[in-house]
Amino acid sequence: MGKEKFSRSKPHVNVGTIGHVDHGKTTLTAAITSVLAAKFGGTAKAYDQIDAAPEEKARGITINTAHVEYETANRHYAHVDCPGHADYVKNMITGAAQMDGAILVVSAADGPMPQTREHILLARQVGVPYIIVFLNKCDMVDDAELLELVEMEVRELLDKYEFPGDTTPIIHGSAKLAMEGDKGPMGEQAIMKLADALDSYIPLPERAIDGAFLMPVEDVFSISGRGTVVTGRVERGIIKVGEEIEIVGIHDTQKTTCTGVEMFRKLLDQGQAGDNVGILLRGTKREDVQRGQVLCKPGSIKPHTHFTGEIYVLSKDEGGRHTPFFNNYRPQFYFRTTDVTGAIELPEGKEMVMPGDNVSIIVKLINPIAMEEGLRFAIREGGKTVGAGVVAKIIA
């Protein structure tokens, strides 16, 4: 079956929905696709098409994020809808890592809830640079003062996690009304306002297209008759069909060749920074590649286990630990797409670290990870995020 080529006529931006469960993330995602498809062309996606995606079996393997695409007058957007439940945090992290900006959905009827806070914190942690707020279900709130109060609460929460609360666009509307074809200010007009905010508030990302090719592995599929396909978002550089690449991290570094690139099921000659792609690898077995590794230009990045980091430990109120930790504490370090256990060495004279502290640490991981200074990570314990950090200096 011949695949159509993917058009690059408009600049491409990655966004996604975040926020508390049942505040309307998926309904809003569906509303955006239907309103913008009617106006600028594209495909409307129904709620259940998007909602099914978190548990979707694609070629027999579960993918945990729904990807949709839509266009505004000026741009092409790829949009991920992250599942909202707390136990999906790992997927939220991988989803949020693919965003040039996030749409935070807050129910006007409920106001900010625990996952609202958690998702803003995660956005801060995984380096989502911009947040736009969609205050949903405004049709259910008659009191204008109450709406103002909720908006104020959201702005304060954004400030707390170092997003510019005062200048963040907050759009009032109802995703449900928009889905039902309501042409009023709460319906389609609110979606168009949101589209304008996406275009004007989220700057075109400075793509690291000139860097050495790097793509964190998110998923691996075996496709009969074609070989092994690795999916992920190209972090930087360009990958062309026929180029040699390395698989780095966890195991010994392996060399392979890219024999195909596809995006939204369309074939490309190349994948470039910012693209969500599938890369076909020659002669690589399904079991030779796993989440947590990276594909990269040969020699451009090395695997490491030993580094110093600057970390912030979440307070109890932020959902972090209730007790301090001590030297040789062994949590999981979440790099890009996976958890790796590591031991923490505290600075001399520092006996313990309290929730809410920030501290310089030395870390030794049990498996090597493709690493550079400036790489961000989360610290997790039993599936719960307890800290955030950045690689300050590589030791070995």
UniProtKB/Swiss-Prot annotation:
Region (G5), start-end ranges: 174-176
Binding site for Mg(2+): T26
Enzyme Commission code: 3.6.5.3
Annotated Gene Ontology cellular component terms: cytosol
Residue ranges constituting the tr-type G domain according to the UniProt record: 10-206
Region (G2): 60-64
GO molecular function: GTP binding; GTPase activity; guanosine tetraphosphate binding; translation elongation factor activity
Keywords linked to the UniProt accession: Cytoplasm, Elongation factor, GTP-binding, Hydrolase, Magnesium, Metal-binding, Nucleotide-binding, Protein biosynthesis
Reaction(s) the record says it catalyses: GTP + H2O = GDP + phosphate + H(+)
InterPro entries the UniProt entry points to: EF-Tu_GTP-bd, EF-Tu_GTPase, EFTu-like_2, EFTU_2, G_TR_CS, P-loop_NTPase, Small_GTP-bd, T_Tr_GTP-bd_dom
Binding site for GTP: 19-26, 81-85, 136-139
Disulfide bond annotation, renumbered to this chain: none
Region: G4, residue numbers: 136-139
Chain spans, region G1: 19-26
Chief location bin: cytoplasm
Subcellular location: Cytoplasm
Region (G3): 81-84
Gene3D superfamilies membership: P-loop containing nucleotide triphosphate hydrolases, Translation factors
Function recorded in the entry: GTP hydrolase that promotes the GTP-dependent binding of aminoacyl-tRNA to the A-site of ribosomes during protein biosynthesis.
Subunit structure, interactors included: Monomer.
Name by which UniProt lists this protein: Elongation factor Tu 1
Species this chain originates from: Albidiferax ferrireducens (strain ATCC BAA-621 / DSM 15236 / T118) (Rhodoferax ferrireducens)
